[in-house]
Amino acid sequence: MSKLLKKQNRKRITRKVRRAIKAVRKPRRKVVARKPMARSSAPAKVKLKDKVLFEIEHYPQTEEFTSSAACAMMVLKHVNTDFKMKKEEEYSIWQEAVNGSVWHGSKYGLAYSIAKRGGKVKILSNTKDEGYDRKLAVYENVNLDTLTASWNEMKKKSEDAHVIEEYTSNVSINSIKKALSTNHIPIVLIDANALNPYLDSSPHWIVVKGYDKDAFYINDPYSDSTITLDHDAFKQALGYDNNFHIILTDTRHKVTRKKR
């Protein structure tokens, strides 16, 4: 082979090698089909309704200390038409609801008494302990260890009854609007004095049956009928001693009497 041909062959080989090296250094870019963006798993924002009003039969408490039981009975009657709102049932529920509190009914006792009778219940609260009940226990000369033991027992019973609890620092009237807008009836802790200036300041439970742009509509077991409170007044009434508790019952979960 002539020197000229050898030289030309070397040039060809050199060019091939260079192209091969470039191909290794810069691989061809593959076209990959884009996957659709995954949707956020965050819960959808609830759109508040302009107005909501549940038809909830009113039941007045028969004793100064049974507001929790009276409220539970009103809610249970709404989700279970067979439920009988009688004084005997009021006492039976109060004996459960009072556990974990001094006398008015704890959030766990109240939630458990509804769940035990078939309700689907959720607690919305800003506290994880006995809260104001410790102060009441000292005032009423109730043993704190006994109170704590009872409180823990009812918490466990509530969990066993599938009661869900959500802690939040922002329990507000919007929390109640959201509950009503999603078909939940709220039983709300308030200061009794905020509704009735003739009553001493004390923890008291009420049923909120609805709202509109002007007011909230409340079944107060201490009164004989539904009362109305404008938004500002209701906001001021919420909670007791900076403790805010709302017991929510899902109205879509209807309770039916078991066939024998």
PLM features: residue spans?
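Noncatalytic regulatory segments and standalone regulatory/sensor domains
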Residues: 98, 180-181, 187, 191-260
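Short amphipathic alpha-helical surface micro-motifs
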Residues: 103-105, 167-171, 189, 226-231
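Short amphipathic alpha-helical segments and helix-helix/interface helices
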Residues: 110-111, 173-177, 235
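Active-site-adjacent structural segments surrounding the nucleophilic cysteine of cysteine proteases
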Residues: 2-149, 153-160, 169-170, 199, ...
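Internal catalytic-core helix/loop-beta-alpha segment
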Residues: 149-190
